[in-house]
């Protein structure tokens, strides 16, 4: 386990796993940072990268991220799974409501993972002028409570 402290004194930790390490890679900065930190501190891991195909086009960045990470950390293994379903809402039998793609990861891949990371971040402590609405993290927070191996370190 590696412990970190941010510039504003928030603490988080990351841990390796003997099994597969799952990561929800959106193509954004948060999940890129998470994957980079994991690879920097934990060598010779097998990473299962889950990218949910959403209509916002963010998936195009995940290929570039994986090319960069694979070159920089060649002793790790990377396997990408493109998950269909995008932003469609679903109330699944999993006990949480959320997006179809995320439900698919929990339903079909979770049991083969030692840990599943998400780069979701907490909402900003202050409202920003350009935001139209606060991001809704409730489904991910409920999943973190319900699914023992699912974690959002940020």
Task: Name what the model sees in each region.
Residues 1-154:
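ATP-dependent adenylation/nucleotidyltransferase module used to activate substrates
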């Amino acid at each position: 386990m590696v412990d970190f402290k941010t510039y504003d004194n928030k603490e988080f930790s990351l841990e390796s796993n003997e099994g597969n390490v799952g990561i929800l890679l959106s193509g954004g900065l948060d999940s890129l940072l998470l994957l980079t930190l994991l690879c920097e501190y934990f060598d010779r891991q097998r990473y299962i990268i889950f990218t949910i195909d959403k209509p916002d086009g963010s998936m195009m960045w995940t290929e570039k991220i994986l090319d960069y990470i694979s070159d920089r950390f060649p002793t790790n293994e990377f396997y990408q799974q493109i998950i269909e379903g995008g932003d469609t809402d679903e109330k699944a039998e999993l006990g949480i409501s959320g997006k179809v793609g995320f439900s698919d990861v929990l339903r079909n891949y979770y049991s083969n993972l030692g840990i599943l990371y998400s780069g979701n971040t907490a909402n900003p402590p202050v409202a920003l002028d350009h935001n139209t609405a606060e991001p809704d993290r409730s489904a991910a927070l409920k999943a973190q409570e319900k699914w023992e191996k699912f974690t959002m370190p940020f």
